[in-house]
Amino acid sequence: GMVAANVLIPPNASSVQSILGLKSGGIDNSKAKTEGINMEYGKPGFDTEDALVEDEIALNKQIAAEGIVLLKNDEGRMPYSTDTTFSFVSHSAVSYIGGNKVDMKTAFEDAGFGVNEDLWKFYSEGNGKDYGLGVGSVSYGDDEDFSINECPLSVMKAEPGLTDSMKNTVPVFVFSRVAGEGRDMPRSMYNHTDVEEDKTKTYLEPDSTELEILQYLNDNFDDVVLLLNSSAAVDLSWVEDYPSIHTVISAPAMGDYGLCSLAEIFSGKANPSG
């Protein structure tokens, strides 16, 4: 009982105090003498809230740009001219981990690029919308779901005109994995897939569904970009099996506006850190 109390009460102290009718302690400094003391320490450096927000956005973009790493750029394929249209492949493109207020489509269009509208709508509102990564650990270990659940190539091919919409575009395969605080990844995929050949794989490598899509892209396009969206290091030993993947770029957790910086790296307006 004592052990349970020591474990459960501290993180829920405010709730326990409320139930017992206790008040949290505090310090009344209203009678403190302030003569000769500058009480306006920490003066705001902005005249308006809008100016503060603009500065926060600029800082977010700067930090994101400096954190993005260009891991591979064979033949100098990147940067791209802004008359390029990109096809963002995988459900992770529309559910980018750690990118919230500005999505990939908006960021790249704002940078002057074209974005494959048919493919974007397929993942965001069409027959590809119900796929995507599991949440990882639930409530710090109460349960876990590390399923990958990527939309299969067969579903993409069954959609009239979808694969044709990718012609004359540069495909960007978004490879995402859930990782971070409270999300210890599984040693294998045994409990997170029904596909036998994937059960012995790790979470940090592509599963059979992803590999089938990557093979299709490799066979049908001469320039493919691999975009990594993971806060954990991933296994990239397989990349050499797909010679059409000329560019690999790592852009984990971009924050609210960081995808704008990613688009500017694709255009050459910003430089990645590596």
Regions found by a protein language model. Give the residues of each.
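C-terminal non-catalytic regions of proteins with extracellular/luminal or membrane-system context
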Residues: 1-274
